[in-house]
Amino acid sequence: MHAAGSSAAQAEMPRLRPELDRTDLVRRAQLGSVAAFEQLVLVVAPSVHRYLALRLRNDSEARDALQETLLAAWQGLPSLKQADKFLPWVLGIATHKAVDARRGRVRTSDADVELQGREDESAGEIRQAILTLPASFRDVLLLRYVLQLSEDEVAEALGVRRGTVKSRTSRARKALGERLR
């Protein structure tokens, strides 16, 4: 019974190989499966929301941009060529939606910065310093270190070459270090 029970339990646990599962979900969603896309949303939405919240500094705008991102992802899904690149592709869409959102608002002051959760003073200083960086530096740092994407995934999300990601990361870290001195 143990052998049969454990193999049945393993058959019911689809998350044994998450990357393969995600790729399979993308392929099924590309064929029109709403259920598969909903599962993808459950997997990627927290990371995309976190990125947008950090980028936009406003949770309400981040939620709106997340919805626009997911709608655009659903509509553009048939054009995605590599199913295993879904997250970087969605983050690329999110980057464009964040730019659109920032263009559409009038910035009143830095007092509207919304920080999620409790942070100690040094983490708050680091976050504030990151937010003062140019967008190209800030995006690379957020994607690379907060969302822990590889250099290749960051490059794909931002639509730039890997070498550009490396140089921006280096320059961003240097600029961040100068701001924190």
What are these regions (language model features)?
Residues 5-10, 15-22, 100, 105-130, ...:
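Internal acidic/polar
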Residues 45, 49, 70, 134, ...:
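C-terminal flanking helix
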Residues 131, 135-139, 147-164, 174-178:
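Helix-turn-helix DNA-binding module
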Residues 126, 140-141:
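Short alpha-helical "packing" element that flanks the helix-turn-helix/winged-helix DNA-binding module
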Residues 75-85, 92-112, 119:
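Arg/Lys-rich amphipathic alpha helix in sigma70-family domain 2
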Residues 43-46, 54-57, 142-150:
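Short helix-capping/turn signature of helix-turn-helix
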Residues 15, 30-39, 49-68, 162:
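Short, charged helix-capping/linker segments at alpha-helix termini
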